[in-house]
Amino acid sequence: MYLINQNGWIEVICGSMFSGKSEELIRRVRRTQFAKQHAIVFKPCIDNRYSEEDVVSHNGLKVKAVPVSASKDIFEHITEEMDVIAIDEVQFFDGDIVEVVQVLANRGYRVIVAGLDQDFRGLPFGQVPQLMAIAEHVTKLQAVCSACGSPASRTQRLIDGEPAAFDDPIILVGASESYEPRCRHCHAVPTKQR
């Protein structure tokens, strides 16, 4: 599945918050380094929760990353000796990320992206569904529901300990202070009173 002599391909790692997406991306990047492959990691500038210039998992694993403001900025950092391009928090990138990932894979790079497949409302998030559709390999991870202990496929946003309303802003960068993993049955999204 991961033979480097193959032409380029796309791998998507997705799931809810706290499911281990960044941890899995870091693991795959580290494996490429053991194989003497050259990897570069990108993250959106908006993701500054733990570090400005590292991808950091919730359990503290980290790898150096290049923060970029726009998807097409990724091209400025790619060199011929690169084998693997990794992109974390891909849901925060602009709509051009799908084209950027396609171009990189078509040029022969192994492209690994990680991100939320659903927003806090349980709806498809950003460009992740499109990336899943064009990827050769998709890994969907689950966390453990913080309410009942079942497998969690959704991300619950909390505002002062209560579920956020459906029409609250989609993007709010945060961690355990704002989000919990939830299963389908414990996930709640009330409609906001007008």
Swiss-Prot record:
Subcellular locations according to the entry: Cytoplasm
Catalytic activity of the protein: thymidine + ATP = dTMP + ADP + H(+)
Keywords: ATP-binding, Cytoplasm, DNA synthesis, Kinase, Metal-binding, Nucleotide-binding, Transferase, Zinc
Residues annotated as the enzyme's active site: E89
UniProt KW Zinc keyword: yes
Kinase in keyword set: yes
Transmembrane annotation, as ranges: none
Annotated binding of ATP, by residue: G15, S16, M17, F18, S19, G20, K21, S22, D88, E89, V90, Q91
Enzyme Commission no: 2.7.1.21
GO CC aspect terms: cytosol
One annotated GO molecular function: thymidine kinase activity
Gene3D superfamilies: 3.30.60.20, P-loop containing nucleotide triphosphate hydrolases (3.40.50.300)
UniProt-annotated binding residues for Zn(2+): C145, C148, C183, C186
Listed InterPro entries: P-loop_NTPase, Thymidine_kinase, Thymidine_kinase_CS
Subunit architecture: Homotetramer.
Matching HAMAP family: Thymidine_kinase (MF_00124)
The family this protein is said to belong to: Belongs to the thymidine kinase family.
Protein name: Thymidine kinase
Organism: Bacillus cereus (strain AH820)
Organism lineage: Bacteria, Bacillati, Bacillota, Bacilli, Bacillales
